[in-house]
């Protein structure tokens, strides 16, 4: 089954309790509790330990891994030695194969995304499979002769990887999916998947293979409005159909009414997936009120530093401790801006890495991509400038219309994720000209 809900509605807590319930009521069962990335899995592991403080033995039958990490472990246990191809070990062969087949109109960027999202994503291993595949989300229409030319490139890449003893992460998960689909005993009786909206095609196929042996063997929790890593694809085509088996959480436990309602302006009231499942974002209710979020467009970086410094000063006056405060930016290129604001107030900064460990006595600084799963009493989202979010470099790399739409959607989702990490206080700042998203976050005539 699938459970959805906007940020702060308790999807992760429900997933944790679901995993514990499955282990408790099925004494011989093994349960996989998973997320799509290692940093998020690390955070989930810590939360499970806290939940099972009085039942530590229960945790022995619940394994917490990222999907790729458990894939690597199972591959080496059941298949053999594993050598995962790096991005460079795939990108350069694509470039070389492209040159080898002669002149054509396709850019290296197009070839790379076609490989990632279609050929490797769906693990197409024959010309016929590539010829007939529905290239969902790829708006560049390809005639059969164009597909044949492209396949000649990708076939060179596939054979080259095989000759070098390399396999992609998608390939690894595909081998495992076939292994279990062909009758091997699944390593888990149940799989509980949190942050499911960012699972890849190969990850969903792998989960479908290991979770098919039990009724309700698979449980997914996620929010399409927080999809920031994956392009949309059909879960049904990948082996998982949740139509008619979904529920939506409506009570927001984390975020004040003022912050939630302001952040909701960034997203449409309804978001549909490729299979036609619709997530209704209306009707969520927060359990408490708080100060109105502040949005400031400053004339310079120095003015922004002073504004955030003054905000930090007011938080200290209200009794907040540094570890209860976080500042998020789009990428590491903007880290100097939160550091300068903290320094103005004499506060130490802890730059979060993939372990997501905060430090007593320090406010946290992080990119928006690492914000998932985190919660702070006060959050500032800095450097929301034009060409920073949405990131101009991503826009310039776009090769087709559908990809541009997805860039805008995921960048908007990033800002939503960052803003909804705040419980009580939210400040969003930029220098002029500001990101176009700020005009959606709050009406233009209310910008300060």
Predicted features along the sequence, with ranges:
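ATP-hydrolysis module of ASCE/P-loop NTPase motor domains
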Residues: 78-146
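Short, electropositive alpha-helical surface patch
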Residues: 436-448
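Conserved pre-motif I regulatory segment
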Residues: 1
